[in-house]
UniProtKB/Swiss-Prot annotation:
Pfam families: BTB, zf-C2H2. The keyword Coiled coil does not apply. There is a cross-link at K143, K263 (Glycyl lysine isopeptide (Lys-Gly) (interchain with G-Cter in SUMO2)). Belongs to the krueppel C2H2-type zinc-finger protein family. It comes from Homo sapiens. This is Zinc finger and BTB domain-containing protein 48. Zn(2+) 1 binds at C293, C296, H309, H313. The gene is ZBTB48. It is found in: Nucleus; Chromosome, Telomere.
Length: 688
């Protein structure tokens, strides 16, 4: 190999090591007992088979390693970048365990070749000091340790010859089972190592002969102790994932983890002396069942990650950055945030290339650049509107130009703007799940935003957004903006088929069903279908439910539908929010107002006090109505009296007959001119 190429590779590794120390271009975050290490995935994958298998799906992220590796993981990371491994007699066992767990064969070979520096008397002695203690020999590898001195360990792996062995060493021999007294010699010692590392038969396995470390399913995950080799790997995503949530697509990754941690039936070195022996027996036998979330039924590898996952249902974010105040569900996310040095990012400024003006946010710079270019980056292809962000253009195309929403529900074909909205829709509408639970009252919400609105409105009584027209308060500004449209008359949602506009997207969706003929809400008792859910509920309550389950607590009146009860309660409260624009009369229901407006369409100058006469049609101002009174009480004025229509009721059918008096003269003092009068005989028992 050419020497210049070797120097080039060394220089590249040196530059990568410098980048690692500065935290530049590092796409891997390693959390080891609270210590965060930055590294390059490519270097980790080249040096460790474990990291290579973990990155096999091509997704980076954060890896959480056990706290017991915190003291020696920096040595292994330095070995990845420099080839130097600083071993001592105190850290050799821990480095060997970590190298085996992470599957770093070169580091394992160096640890096996390492031998602490001993005195001449001990080197030539017989049974007094040959080799390390038996507890360490049992944990050694099959290969016999070579005579590598302590001060010679900090060298590159390429300079360590494989054929160098101490002068007194021999090839490993099969141990003599009938002579246990000869176990002090080097060859018999290596034979014991081989015998200890031979796989145990299934029928001969005993806890004292073959100690198998527990699988990671038993790991509590909260704080891993130094004496346990249980550990878990968590690939962290942007939105504070659920940690060790076990789903079907992750089965391959789970198998990889189990293959990494499962070891042959042999006694492995512990992170601290006697830790494996002190381990509870119930943790050494069998495999624990994954814990399940009682709310959404997701399964997790440990109780710790279930506890973290429950914070998503409650909205709790206990880990707050002391510098910028940002909160996180998990401590690992906070550590990663702090490793990125949030204050330096907040102090970053963006400079305009034209006028050199500086801005604290990139979005402010984009808005400023419009003053120079006169154009926004995103333009609508159907109209002349422009937008600063792509999502605003997408929302504009959907609302005004009828563009389809990108994420469709496979069950009901309803579409959504984001994948998160689709997932919440599937969980709430099709699976009946309300994943977010209020800790104070147990109220369940289908979204985190809905839970926060509930807490603000019910428990904190926070309504900071007040309408400037009617002083009505809201918990969210979006609700206030929607309410303001009732005052301003704004209707931003337009039907792309007929051009009709609406205040809300929900109203537009209901209107679109008039074009498509869609009736998605079907009755489970009959074949009738509805365009909205409200009419379906009223139909079921009135047609298919027996009794009147909803009753008023004020007067005790019962109703079939809860909506009828709500309207009735408004009467007790004096609420009549549907007002007639012609006469000012108010109603409790909009249907009553629509029926009332029909009177104004056929009768002019309608007075609400004349509601009892609404069945009579008056055609002329000179006309007056003659009520059905006894003839003795009938008063006639100086105008023509024409009764066009009598009130429809039981009285009209009881009239015996009518008498028409035409061109007759009246001498009464109250009659000034001849009139045409229609009279009727009224029974005496009528008290109308």
């Amino acid at each position: 190999m050419d020497g210049s190429f070797v120097q080039h590779s060394v220089r590249v590794l040196q530059e990568l090591n410098k980048q690692r120390e500065k935290g530049q271009y590092c796409d891997a975050t390693l959390d080891v007992g609270g210590l965060v290490f930055k590294a390059h995935w490519s270097v980790l994958a080249c040096c460790s088979h474990f990291f290579q298998s973990l990155y096999g799906d091509g997704s980076g992220g954060s890896v959480v390693l056990p706290a017991g590796f915190a003291e020696i993981f920096g040595l292994l990371l330095d070995f990845f970048y420099t080839g130097h491994l600083a071993l001592t007699s105190g850290n050799r066992d821990q480095v060997l365990l970590a190298a085996r767990e992470l599957r770093v064969p070169e580091a394992v070979e160096l640890c096996q070749s390492f031998k602490p520096k001993t005195s001449v008397g001990q080197a030539a002695g017989g049974q007094s000091g040959l080799g390390p203690p038996a507890s360490q020999n049992v944990n050694s590898h099959v290969k016999e340790p070579a005579g590598l001195e302590e001060e010679e360990v900090s060298r590159t792996l390429g300079l360590v010859p494989r054929d160098q062995e101490p002068r007194g060493s021999h090839s490993p021999q099969r141990p003599q089972l009938h002579s246990p007294a000869q176990s002090e010699g080097p060859s018999s010692l290596c034979g014991k190592l081989k015998q200890a590392l031979k796989p145990c038969p299934l029928e001969d396995k005993k806890p004292e002969d073959c100690k198998v470390p527990p699988r990671p399913l038993e790991a509590e995950g909260a704080q891993l102790q130094g004496g346990s080799n249980e550990w878990e790997v968590v690939v962290q995503v942007e939105d504070d994932g659920d940690g060790d949530y076990m789903s079907e697509p992750e089965a391959v990754l789970t198998r990889r983890k189990s293959n990494v941690i499962r070891k042959p039936c042999a006694a492995e070195p512990a992170l601290s002396a006697g830790s494996l022996a002190a381990e509870p027996a119930e943790n050494r036998k069998g495999t624990a069942v994954p814990v399940e979330c009682p709310t959404c039924h997701k399964k997790f590898l440990s109780k710790y990650y279930l506890k973290v996952h429950n914070r998503k249902h409650t909205g709790e974010k206990p880990f707050e950055c002391p510098k910028c105040g940002k909160c996180y569900f998990r401590k690992e996310n906070l550590l990663e945030h702090e490793a990125r040095n949030c204050m330096n990012r907040s102090e970053q400024v963006f400079t305009c290339s034209v006028c050199q003006e500086t801005f604290r946010r990139r979005m402010e710079l984009r808005v400023h650049m419009v003053s120079h270019t006169g154009e926004m980056p995103y333009k609508c292809s159907s109209c002349s509107q422009q937008f600063m962000q792509k999502k605003d253009l997408q929302s504009h195309m959907i609302k005004l130009h009828g563009a389809p929403k990108p994420h469709a529900c496979p069950t009901c074909a309803k579409c959504f703007l984001s994948r998160t909205e689709l997932q919440l829709h599937e969980a709430f509408k099709h699976r009946g799940e309300k994943l977010f639970v209020c800790e104070e009252c147990g109220h369940r919400a289908s979204s985190r935003n809905g839970l926060q609105m509930h807490i603000k409105a019910k428990h904190r009584n926070e309504r900071p957004h007040v309408c400037e027209f009617c002083s009505h308060a809201f918990t969210q500004k979006a609700n206030l903006n929607m309410h303001l449209r009732t005052h301003t008359g704004e209707k931003p949602f337009q039907c792309h088929l007929c051009g009709k506009t609406f205040r809300t997207q929900a109203s537009l969706d209901k209107h679109n069903r008039t074009h498509t003929g869609e009736r998605p809400f079907s009755c489970e008792f009959c074949e009738q279908r509805f365009t909205e859910k409200g009419p379906l509920l009223r139909h079921v309550a009135s047609r298919h439910q027996e009794g009147r389950p909803h009753f008023c607590q004020i007067c005790g009146k019962t109703f079939k539908a809860v909506e009828q009860l709500r309207v009735h309660v408004r009467r007790h409260k004096g609420v009549r929010k549907f007002e007639c624009t012609e006469c000012g009369y108010k109603f409790t229901r909009q249907a009553h107002l629509r029926r009332h407006m029909e009177i104004h369409d056929r009768v002019e100058n309608y007075n609400p006090r004349q509601r009892k006469l609404r069945n009579l049609i008056i055609e002329d101002e000179k006309m007056v109505v003659v009520a059905l009174q006894p003839p003795a009480e009938l008063e006639v004025g100086s105008a023509e009296v024409i009764v066009e229509s009598l009130a429809q009721g039981g009285l009209a059918s009881q009239l015996p007959g009518q008498r028409l008096c035409a061109e007759e003269s009246f001498t009464g003092p109250g009659v000034l001119e001849p009139s045409l009068i229609i009279t009727a005989a009224v029974p005496e028992d009528c008290d109308t």
